[in-house]
């Protein structure tokens, strides 16, 4: 059972509310709207706002009390934009270019069954780096993900970057199936908590699937300000919520 007092449920998107990069199902959408009648709900994802809309609907800011794309670097509350932070003013152009150039030369040397396009996506709060390229098809995405599980392509890439850019104040975080994020230290999903910690919640629940060390849900999952639940799929999220808030 849930703890008494005002509470907020924060959900990761991919693998938690939806299948990776897929749209939310009608059943899950309806379930969350019912849940919202009992408790405040919010989403926090690494993706940009457009991708969150693609997955959760164009009216996402009306359907959730809080929407935090890019780990909360972009923040919406009660349907209105709260704030937007950007990576270039924080890190400076020189470091960003060094990072982009290094990633592109590393990707050029990696042999994969397939490579597509958009290897680096520049977002407000992070760089998203994909060895196969974000424009791959769903089938190619799954093929890469299966290969990555065996060969640790992303893990090796990240280990190399951590060595190369040690001491530069950067965090490298693997999430989803085909990419990893690079952002300033402290700009992980915990960043979104600054937007909610003064809103009077007694408990902030967090649900995510990449909660292991190195996963992009790990920091917020283990943060003392949250009660974390590790899930394997949207069905799992729903089951736990039903147990907590029935």
From Swiss-Prot:
<comment type="similarity">
    <text>Belongs to the eukaryotic PMM family.</text>
</comment>
<feature type="binding site">
    <location>
        <position position="12"/>
    </location>
    <ligand>
        <name>Mg(2+) 1</name>
    </ligand>
</feature>
<dbReference type="GO" id="GO:0046872">
    <property type="term" value="F:metal ion binding"/>
</dbReference>
<keyword id="KW-0479">Metal-binding</keyword>
<dbReference type="InterPro" id="IPR036412">
    <property type="entry name" value="HAD-like_sf"/>
</dbReference>
<dbReference type="InterPro" id="IPR006379">
    <property type="entry name" value="HAD-SF_hydro_IIB"/>
</dbReference>
<protein>
    <recommendedName>
        <fullName>Phosphomannomutase 2</fullName>
        <ecNumber>5.4.2.8</ecNumber>
    </recommendedName>
</protein>
<comment type="pathway">
    <text>Nucleotide-sugar biosynthesis; GDP-alpha-D-mannose biosynthesis; alpha-D-mannose 1-phosphate from D-fructose 6-phosphate: step 2/2.</text>
</comment>
<dbReference type="GO" id="GO:0009298">
    <property type="term" value="P:GDP-mannose biosynthetic process"/>
</dbReference>
<feature type="binding site">
    <location>
        <position position="14"/>
    </location>
    <ligand>
        <name>Mg(2+) 1</name>
    </ligand>
</feature>
<feature type="binding site">
    <location>
        <position position="223"/>
    </location>
    <ligand>
        <name>Mg(2+) 2</name>
    </ligand>
</feature>
<feature type="binding site">
    <location>
        <position position="141"/>
    </location>
    <ligand>
        <name>alpha-D-mannose 1-phosphate</name>
    </ligand>
</feature>
<dbReference type="GO" id="GO:0006013">
    <property type="term" value="P:mannose metabolic process"/>
</dbReference>
<comment type="function">
    <text>Involved in the synthesis of the GDP-mannose and dolichol-phosphate-mannose required for a number of critical mannosyl transfer reactions.</text>
</comment>
<feature type="binding site">
    <location>
        <position position="21"/>
    </location>
    <ligand>
        <name>alpha-D-mannose 1-phosphate</name>
    </ligand>
</feature>
<dbReference type="InterPro" id="IPR043169">
    <property type="entry name" value="PMM_cap"/>
</dbReference>
<dbReference type="GO" id="GO:0004615">
    <property type="term" value="F:phosphomannomutase activity"/>
</dbReference>
<dbReference type="InterPro" id="IPR005002">
    <property type="entry name" value="PMM"/>
</dbReference>
<feature type="active site" description="Proton donor/acceptor">
    <location>
        <position position="14"/>
    </location>
</feature>
<feature type="binding site">
    <location>
        <position position="181"/>
    </location>
    <ligand>
        <name>alpha-D-mannose 1-phosphate</name>
    </ligand>
</feature>
<dbReference type="GO" id="GO:0005829">
    <property type="term" value="C:cytosol"/>
</dbReference>
<feature type="binding site">
    <location>
        <position position="123"/>
    </location>
    <ligand>
        <name>alpha-D-mannose 1-phosphate</name>
    </ligand>
</feature>
<feature type="binding site">
    <location>
        <position position="179"/>
    </location>
    <ligand>
        <name>alpha-D-mannose 1-phosphate</name>
    </ligand>
</feature>
<keyword id="KW-0413">Isomerase</keyword>
<comment type="subunit">
    <text>Homodimer.</text>
</comment>
<feature type="binding site">
    <location>
        <position position="134"/>
    </location>
    <ligand>
        <name>alpha-D-mannose 1-phosphate</name>
    </ligand>
</feature>
<keyword id="KW-0007">Acetylation</keyword>
<dbReference type="InterPro" id="IPR023214">
    <property type="entry name" value="HAD_sf"/>
</dbReference>
<keyword id="KW-0460">Magnesium</keyword>
<feature type="binding site">
    <location>
        <position position="209"/>
    </location>
    <ligand>
        <name>Mg(2+) 1</name>
    </ligand>
</feature>
<feature type="binding site">
    <location>
        <position position="221"/>
    </location>
    <ligand>
        <name>Mg(2+) 2</name>
    </ligand>
</feature>
<dbReference type="GO" id="GO:0006487">
    <property type="term" value="P:protein N-linked glycosylation"/>
</dbReference>
<feature type="modified residue" description="N-acetylalanine">
    <location>
        <position position="2"/>
    </location>
</feature>
<dbReference type="Pfam" id="PF03332">
    <property type="entry name" value="PMM"/>
</dbReference>
<feature type="modified residue" description="N6-acetyllysine">
    <location>
        <position position="149"/>
    </location>
</feature>
<feature type="active site" description="Nucleophile">
    <location>
        <position position="12"/>
    </location>
</feature>
<feature type="binding site">
    <location>
        <position position="226"/>
    </location>
    <ligand>
        <name>Mg(2+) 2</name>
    </ligand>
</feature>
<keyword id="KW-0963">Cytoplasm</keyword>
